[in-house]
């Protein structure tokens, strides 16, 4: 059941109510109190009864019989809505959380940070926990870390770590000069270690990182940086090693995260920040889902219509609002230069990008931009589970 409230001071008439969200009105659905107009996947247009005038303070309720799947969350209903008038103009409509008949828990959004324990199960703060930890003594937390890299691989890792910490923790000064109180960090090549393995040796007044290459050195620095941040921010909970050893290597060779930018677009700066977060947690694969029914996000010179047409959604465009977007034009795509920059950014952090182009299925956006790819004998007798 969906209710439109007129909170304005004047009556409205001759309108259509358009909405989208995760919810999907089935192709066989019926409406009580109105009529179903246009419908594509998660986009639905509702027509009020003929001649309806919604006065100031009045409400109009429509009951839809036939959703593609039942609601499970308060975000499953209409997340974006607007009124459409005959002249093509629109008026944004505010939406409220979906409620079910009966009891409703308070809506939650975002995350609930896990509290830092007063008495932790480990003396230092490292995630994931290393394979081998043998610390004989903890000492004072240094003001920061002075990276004394000499060979090319250590220098590249040190530069990447500096950029990583400045990106994620700009004001903390984790990397600093010796004259600013930084703890000396030395780098030593050990060819017997695996590519992502590292060993930290703590001695009074310095730390040594042993690795076989750039990624191993970077992971060693990240381990050291995590320890420093834990001891710096929670000195009564975690310590900083003065003597001992830490040795680690990933248990899994493929440690990935998937991001669907076709259904919801994120800009290049947001992608670079996500890569920084992946690196800080030592993930080494980024699954970049760049196309789907809802949009196409990659610039290709030979097919400019892909981004000119299918990178955008909105009222009056080739692809309507979907998954909660509103009437306004929304979306975007990644230029070739932006993609090159993102790939280089990932490589610096030991991350391999796995681009995902969803075909031959999930090609609605592709076929909207290049209609000659459609089978001329296809009559549209069936649809995907997503309603395309």
Place the predicted regions along the sequence by residue.
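Acidic, contiguous N-terminal accessory segments
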Residues: 75-215, 219-250
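Feature activates predominantly on carbohydrate-active enzymes
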Residues: 199-387
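Intrinsically disordered, low-complexity Pro/Gly/Ser/Thr-rich segments with frequent PxxP/GP/PP motifs
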Residues: 30-71
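Intrinsic-disorder/low-complexity, polar/charged segments enriched in Ser/Thr/Lys/Arg/Asp/Glu/Gln
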Residues: 1, 14, 59-61, 206
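Short aromatic-acidic-glycine turn motif
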Residues: 11, 20-33
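Asparagine-centered strand-capping/turn motif at beta-strand->loop junctions
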Residues: 1-9, 21
